Swiss-Prot record:
It is found in: Plastid, Chloroplast. Its cofactor is Zn(2+). It is an enzyme of class 2 (transferase). It comes from Populus trichocarpa (Western balsam poplar). Coiled coil: none annotated. Binds 1 Zn(2+) ion per subunit. The gene is rpoC2. SUPFAM superfamilies: beta and beta-prime subunits of DNA dependent RNA-polymerase. It comes from the Eukaryota. Its main location: plastid. This is DNA-directed RNA polymerase subunit beta''.
Length: 1390
């Protein structure tokens, strides 16, 4: 018994771990028997005290934490600020989500930490406190839910629900919180049931793998070890101690020249403390990995037995102990999830706080600016950064580790405890994260713009997926798109005037043709379909683009204002009406469409005009088929070469098609929600109700196809035949049958008179039948003579220009054509190709310039198109901007950047009254704004889309017209329809006066109000429209621009005379500029909304509302620049790392994944950096002769270590301590097999055979030849099925297969393991049954190992490894593995 002087007197509360330590001390001091006596007394004392205290639990014992109120309030305040930043476009959705999760997680953690001190101060003998903090019942997180806050919950997939439960269970939950809480509770119940069985099965498999591992030797004689170093403080001291205690040293440990520990000495607590104090060299220890026994283990490699603290006894079944010690905690932990189920546990980053008030200084050269993952600006330091904080009397030095974010600027004043840096926490992120795609959807409809370049990958030239190279904003410029229920097309191009009867603003039908129909005979609109093609990406091919819809009920008129040829940006197309007087043929409903490039310059062989012949026009949908001549539809993407915006023909595609066929079918496109009154594959007659408000126009067979958000209903007219089974009609696509073919039916046979189209249809569960459909035949002619329409200039000297006619089919062979109700489909287009004789000598005449000449005779104005050949690179002098008479052209080097339009439409003053005379009908002017011809649609700017800013009063409501008392009386403006000469009036504007420009033209208007004729004067309002480059376009005093406040809703930044704009701020407002919300524009800083500047006046600014969305590099943008998006369309896709819930139910599958060696989906993010760090060391290693050998060995060792660390990490996160050696025994079994390669020694092992690693090495030594093999990780199930004992395998899985194979191969089972003996009823070779198998280890050492040849590797290799040992220790310990929680690194062979 020890002396009294060495005993300690403890006077403090002790928990479980402290008791463990005391017991181990007792055993050291007093031995086993006496210790058990002491512990018996402690147990009795505990029972007595518990009986005397008799803890009871009531609801009043749950004391809530007083500081909870303001903590939650603070978190809500932070969330609110975050929401604002997101709204202003400073952070994007992911950063917002991340930060809000961390805000609430931190709040919840603070509350949890407050709990213990709160109980201690207010009521130390509180039963809840006593039970949970002594560890007797419950743990901190459970009590935290009762008295703190329940916090963030995870759904059944382990994903986080970002709405926190702020109440605790004592206060009670609101309805929403209760529903969210049920998620977690259900998860708890399910996990308890399901995962417990999983944990049990895991235990069974683990025991199966290692059941034969028994301690059968004292020393295997290995010289290898694994080095553990506590240097640099990489490994936490606690883990370092756990790793070393109970192990055996593989090498002597020296302190200077003095040896402080010898080889094969086991390490106790005293020795570890000496290692820590002396900070010795890396300590080499023996582990099960290094044991040289093939199918068992030796005492020294295993180390101390955890039961009695001495070296493990011979014959102990350490394998089964290892399997159970890993499997059992899983079972326990899954049971525990029942209570805390679903509560989210994650990690937050560590912060560095300032030690005192003062000014902070650091080296600017070592940091570069970046964004944190919450979207805050910060500096990233790539190496250790030394920061000094100078207060009045003292200078503090703080070191910030590499890869951290510095959140303050140089020379900034910081306060004490202010967060100055955030350390990137590498520990928790690796284990519980996953890569997730997050789509951001548009909140409103409008036009998309972005403020940066985007990458177009070469293969995606035509697609709408773009990668962002840098952080930028996407803007959605608001505007209601007009989706008409009849024709979803844009009637006019960008920046047009709109005259009589365009689309009504509601999403309705095309408004009635004019009331005064006697004067206005017809109106013609030609347009291009907004193709929402079947491909999701909305990529248009040109055939869709060039297809025209000529509406059946709107005809061209020969009124002159209709042939004002206005220049359009992007694709300039002009309508020249056919005079029906000239052409008496079928040409009254058609027109020629001239397409002029943006810069007004034609190249040779380019398409000059289109004409759509009415005889090739169909009202219904259908399919085109050609006769089988090798023919191409000309309009393919790659066939049309765009040369500087000009479409050119390639002559090789001008082949003749004699005839083609059109198979008609009726197509109805219905919304997804519509209720059908007919069934699929049924036959209906004419005028059958299809839906509530649709009737069929033809009879026939119905086919219904459901697509995304819509249904397609097709009606095929024709006869139905039921063929015999032998009929070989193509199952999928139909076939054309020419006249005269005999069609055999089961009852009759008849000759086909016309062409028919036969299509086989197989309804589900019914007999298939054949549908015979009628076919329309079109013969191809040369089209009409378009050249007559463009007579050449008589004064021309040489006849140089030629116009050539080409016909082509607009649709591909067999391509379904979908028409829209009440519109016609053009099947063949006639094309006019411009050509001229190239002068062989001079290469400069390459291009023809086109412009319009307008001649006015007696008030009649005619437009002529003039084409002349010009030498390229000659710029013409432009006329002045306001000169109405001059005509000018611009040079071709930058047509898109200039603000003078080459086709400037000249309004002469005589025409305005004339047009007033001709159109005295009701007129509605609607707004069109579309800059993107590829995706046609219209946008109407209405009251919700623009706003006005008044510096004095801020934003006011527009519902009331306020009388304004300014110096000039305001003429009231009514929102009514008026004749063409006036602008559209503006309703609900209270102080609109300052929008009026200096030329105020008073117009007499007749307004019908309550059947009274009022004479009233109104002011004509004038607007400017800017183009993309910020230039003002279309500033003509008489034009009515497209931006009219129709339903009146834009936002005006109105200037009051009392407040002048700041000179500096005003100068920076440009047209087209994007302004974020809350930018200070005036001295008193009004609250702006975000938008694009449309109109700038001296005293007010009008913005078009726009919403910014932030996108960071690597995000994918969907859609094209200028495309019109609807609410709910996908804008951006982010890929980000999301942390998952860290409870054991997420952890157990991870353990299983590691042990079954399944591939992990995502590679760690830091992989590249790790490899970079390694490169330096690798070059030094590869330089030596045996580098490859070392590399192979290192790979095996390192992969084993990382497997151990991964498993440990999961258990440590749950507070479970498992000794490394248990995991090592299992990992050793997984990694101890190798696969013999093809080119190996085939006379010993067959290629593809699995053999033990040690066995392979022995075979090599015996044969003195190299065997090529690859290391494999087997996984515990496969390892169980590839042992040496077939009885053990058969009792695990696949009994019949294993036994049959063993019988065929004649396998012998030596009954070495435990399981085989249990199955056969023999004595198991462990414990007392082990004695007969004991080895004479002394004899093993005496016999010398003789070889015929001297092994060349032996001496040199030892020296190399010895020489480079320091190198390994340094480079591996620094760089190889994510060091945070690892226990040991590297290896050496001495």
């Amino acid at each position: 018994m020890a002396e009294r002087a060495n005993l300690f007197f403890h006077n403090k509360v002790i928990d479980g771990t402290a008791i463990k330590r005391i017991i181990s001390r007792f055993i050291d001091h007093f031995g086993m028997a006496y210790t058990s006596h002491i512990l018996d007394q402690v147990k009795t004392l505990g029972f007595h005290q518990a009986t005397a205290t008799s803890i009871s639990l009531g609801i009043d014992d749950l004391l809530t934490i007083p500081s909870k109120g303001w903590l939650v309030q603070d978190a809500e305040q932070q969330s609110l600020i975050l929401e604002k930043h997101h709204h202003y476009g400073n952070v994007h959705a992911i950063e917002k989500l991340r930060q809000s999760i961390e805000i609430w997680y931190a709040t919840s953690e603070y509350l949890r930490q407050e709990m213990n001190p709160n109980f201690r101060m207010t009521e130390p003998f509180n039963p809840v406190h006593i039970m949970s903090f002594s560890g007797a019942r419950g743990n901190a997180s459970q009590v935290h839910q009762l008295v703190g806050m329940r916090g963030l919950m995870s759904d059944p997939q382990g994903q986080m629900i970002d709405l926190p439960i702020q109440s605790n269970l004592r206060e009670g939950l609101s309805l929403t919180e209760y529903i969210i809480s049920c998620y977690g509770a259900r998860k708890g119940v399910v996990d308890t049931a399901v995962r417990t069985s999983d944990a049990g099965y895991l235990t069974r498999r683990l025991v199966e793998v290692v059941q034969h591992i028994v301690v059968r030797r004292t020393d295997c004689g290995t010289t290898r070890g694994i080095s553990v170093s506590s240097r640099n403080g990489m490994i936490p001291e606690r883990i370092f101690i756990q790793t070393l205690i109970g192990r055996v040293l593989a090498d002597n440990i020296y302190m200077g020249l003095r040896c402080i520990a010898t080889r094969n000495q086991d390490i106790g607590i005293g020795l570890v403390n000496r290692f820590i104090t002396f900070r010795t060299q890396p300590i080499s220890i023996r582990t099960p990995f290094t044991c040289r026994s093939t199918s068992w283990i030796c005492r020294l490699c295993y180390g101390r037995s955890p039961t009695h603290g001495d070296l493990v006894e011979l014959g102990e079944a350490v394998g089964i102990i290892a399997g159970q010690s890993i499997g059992e905690p899983g079972t326990q932990l899954t049971l525990r999830t029942f209570h805390t189920g679903g509560v989210f546990t994650g990690g937050t980053a560590e912060h560095v706080r300032a030690p005192s008030n003062g000014k902070i200084k650091f080296n600017k050269g070592l940091v570069h600016p970046t964004r944190t993952r919450h979207g805050h600006p910060a500096f990233l330091c790539s190496m250790d950064l030394y920061v000094t904080i100078e207060s009045q009397d003292i200078i503090h030095n703080v070191t910030i580790p590499p890869k951290s974010f510095l959140l303050v600027q140089n020379d900034q004043y910081v306060e004490s405890e202010q967060v100055i840096a955030e350390i990137r926490s590498g520990t928790y992120t690796l284990n519980f994260t996953e890569r997730v795609r997050k789509h951001i959807y548009s909140d409103s409809e409008g036009e998309m713009h972005w403020s940066t370049d985007v990458y177009h990958a070469s293969e995606f030239t035509y697609s709408n997926v773009h990668l962002l190279p840098k952080t930028s904003h996407l803007w959605i410029l608001s505007g209601g798109s007009c989706r008409s229920s009849i024709v979803p097309f844009s009637l006019h191009k960008d920046q047009d005037q709109i005259n009589v009867h365009s689309l009504s603003v509601e999403r309705g039908y095309i408004s009635n043709p004019s009331v005064n129909n006697d004067k206005v005979k017809h109106k013609f609109f030609s347009s291009y379909l907004s193709s929402k093609s079947k491909k999701k990406s909305r990529i248009l091919d040109y055939s869709d683009l060039n297809r025209m819809i000529c509406t059946g009920f709107i005809y061209p008129t020969i009124l002159h204002e209709n042939s004002d040829l206005l220049a359009k940006r992007r694709k300039n197309r002009f309508i020249i009406p056919f005079q029906s007087i000239q052409e008496k043929e079928l040409m009254s409903h058609s027109d020629i469409l001239i397409e002029i490039p943006i810069n007004g310059i034609f190249r040779r062989n380019s398409i000059f005009a289109y004409f759509d012949d009415p005889q090739y026009r169909r009202k219904s949908s259908g399919i085109t088929k050609y006769v089988a001549i090798g023919v191409h539809s000309i309009v393919k993407k790659e066939d049309l070469v765009e040369y500087r915006g000009v479409k050119e023909f390639q002559p090789k595609y001008q082949m003749k098609v004699d005839r083609f066929f059109f198979i008609p079918e009726e197509v109805y496109i219905l919304p997804e929600s519509s209720s059908l009154m007919v069934r699929n594959n049924s036959i209906i007659g004419v005028d059958t109700q299809i839906t509530l408000n649709t009737k069929s126009r033809v009879g026939g067979l119905i086919r219904i196809e459901r697509k995304k958000k819509k249904m397609e209903l097709k009606i095929f007219s024709g006869d139905i035949h039921f063929p015999r089974a032998t009929d070989k009609i193509s199952r999928y696509s139909g076939i054309l049958i020419p006249p005269g073919t005999v069609k055999t039916n089961s009852k009759e046979s008849k000759k086909v008179k016309n062409w028919i189209y036969v299509q086989r249809i197989t309804p589900t569960k019914k007999k298939s039948f054949v549908l015979v459909r009628p076919v329309l035949i079109y013969e191809r002619g040369d089209g009409i003579n378009l050249e007559r329409l463009f007579p050449p200039d008589l004064l021309q000297e040489k006849e140089n220009l030629k116009l050539r006619i080409v016909n082509y089919i607009l649709y591909g062979n067999g391509k379904p054509i979908q028409g829209i109700s009440n519109t016609s489909i053009q099947l063949v287009r006639t094309c006019l190709v411009l050509n001229w004789n190239q002068d062989k000598k001079s290469s400069s005449i390459e291009e023809a310039r086109v412009y319009f000449v307008e001649v006015s005779i007696n008030g009649l104005i005619r437009d002529f198109l003039r084409i002349h050949l010009g030498k390229s690179r000659i710029s013409y002098i432009s006329r002045k901007r306001n000169d109405p008479s001059g005509l000018g052209l611009i040079s071709d080097n930058g047509p898109d950047r200039t603000n003078i339009n080459p086709f400037y439409s000249i309004y002469s003053k005589t025409r305005i009254p004339q047009s007033l005379k001709q159109n005295q009908g009701t007129i509605s002017i609607s707004t069109l704004l579309n800059r993107n011809m590829e995706c046609q649609s219209l946008i109407i700017l209405s009251s919700s889309n623009c706003f006005r800013m008044d510096p004095s009063n801020g934003v006011k409501s527009y519902n009331v017209i306020k009388e304004s008392t300014k110096r000039d009386p305001i003429i009231p403006i009514r929102n009514l329809l008026g004749p063409l000469g006036t602008a559209l009036q503006i309703a609900n504007f209270y102080s609109f006066y300052h929008l009026l420009t200096h030329n105020q033209i008073s117009v007499i208007k007749y307004l019908k109000l309550d059947n009274l004729k009022l004479k009233q004067t109104s002011k004509v309002l004038k607007y400017y429209l800017m183009d993309e480059n910020g230039r003002i376009v279309n500033h003509d005093p008489y034009s009515n621009n497209v931006l009219n406040p129709f339903k009146l809703n834009w936002y005006f930044l109105h200037h009051n005379y009392h407040h002048n704009y700041c000179e500096e701020t005003f100068t920076i407002i440009n047209l087209g500029q994007f302004i974020c919300e809350n930018v200070c524009m005036t001295k008193n800083g009004p609250r702006l909304k975000s938008g694009q500047v449309l109109i700038v006046h001296a005293d007010s600014v009008i913005l078009r509302l726009a919403k910014p969305y932030l996108a960071t590099p690597g995000a994918t943008v969907h859609g094209h620049y200028g495309e019109i998006l609807y609410e709910g369309d996908t804008l951006v896709t982010f890929i980000y790392e999301k942390s998952r819930s860290g409870d054991i139910t997420q952890g157990l599958p991870k353990v299983e994944q590691v042990l079954e060696v399944r591939s992990i989906d995502s590679i760690s993010i830091n992989l590249e950096k790790r490899v970079e760090n390694w490169n330096e060391c690798i070059t030094r290693i590869v330089g030596i002769p045996w580098g490859f050998l070392i590399g192979a060995e290192l790979t095996i060792v390192q992969s084993r270590i990382s497997l151990v660390n991964k498993i440990q990490k999961v258990y440590r996160s749950q507070g479970v301590q498992i000794h490394n050696r248990h995991i090592e025994i299992i990992v050793r079994q997984i990694t101890s097999k190798v696969l013999v390669s093809e080119d190996g020694m085939s006379n010993v092992f067959s290629p593809g055979e699995l053999i033990g690693l040690l066995r392979a090495e022995r075979a090599m030594r015996a044969l003195e030849e190299a065997i090529c093999y690859r290391t494999v990780f087997l996984g515990i199930t496969r390892a169980s099925l590839s042992t040496q004992s077939f009885i053990s395998e058969a009792s695990f899985q696949e009994t019949a297969r294993v036994l049959a194979k063993a019988a065929l191969r004649g396998r012998i089972d030596w009954l070495k393991g435990l399981k085989e003996n249990v199955v056969l009823g023999g004595m198991i070779p462990v414990g007392t049954g082990f004695k007969g198998l004991a080895h004479r280890s002394s004899q093993h050492k005496i016999i010398p190992f003789k070889t015929k040849k001297k092994n060349l590797f032996e001496g040199e290799m030892r020296d190399i490894l010895f020489h480079h040992r320091e190198l390994f220790d340094s480079c591996i310990s620094k760089n190889f593995y994510n060091i945070s929680e690892q226990s040991f690194i590297g290896f050496n062979d001495s």
